[in-house]
Every structure is written in structure tokens, then in C-alpha cells.
Amino acid sequence: MTHPGPEVKMIYRGKPSEGRAKIAIINAGQVDLEFLQPIGENSSWKDYLDTEGEGVQHIAFRVEDTAKATEFFKQLGMGVVHQGRFDNDDGSYTYIDSREQLLVNVELLHDDPKK
């Protein structure tokens, strides 16, 4: 389960959020299947469930440079809708609002360098 609080620095539509979700990840070789159940308010997960119902909410890509990837999508008219830090603070996630163009959000995952 994701954890709320300032340590995860969750931002939804430009404002701090306490949104949470239960998460299960199944590793299937080079593909990870992530199942989310929103249990809090103000997140792209809850927004998708409320407007679209159950289904594929995002496709995730690991990136080395989140700012560069975010700028790429911004140039295509797609902005950041939801972002934060991993619960163990070793990386970040950024959701791009690409539902109008791609029917799903794009999630950018960044792992911090190992210390």
C-alpha cells in the first residue's frame, strides 16, 4: 500500500495530495503488471476509476531523466497530472496526462542512483 504524508511528496494537479492506493505487482519477465486499488482521494488513480471505471490506467516507462521526458510530453501538449516519490524514497514517479491522446496515462519511473 502506498503511504501518505510529506515524505512521499505526492502532488496531484499541482497541489499536495494524500491520495493512496493498494498495489500488487506481478513480474512477468520484462513486463510488470501493476494492479491498483485507489483508497484515498485526489490521485490520478481515483480520477481514472471515477471517470472510466476499471481498466488500464497507465503504461509505465523507466527513464534516466524525468525532466527531459516530461518536457518531451509537454511539447506534445501533455502535462504532469500526478507525481511523487516512492515510499522507500529511492526514486520517483510522474504521471503524464495523456488520456486524450493515448487513452491511458503515461507513467515515468526514475530510480535514484544507488548510494
Please provide the spans of the model-predicted regions.
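Core segments of cupin and vicinal oxygen chelate
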Residues: 1-29, 68-97
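Glycine-centered tight beta-turn/hairpin loop motif at sheet-sheet or coil-to-beta transitions
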Residues: 30, 101-103
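Zn2+-dependent peptidoglycan hydrolase active-site motif and core
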Residues: 45
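Histidine- and/or cysteine-centered catalytic micro-motif in compact active-site loops
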Residues: 3-4, 38-40, 64
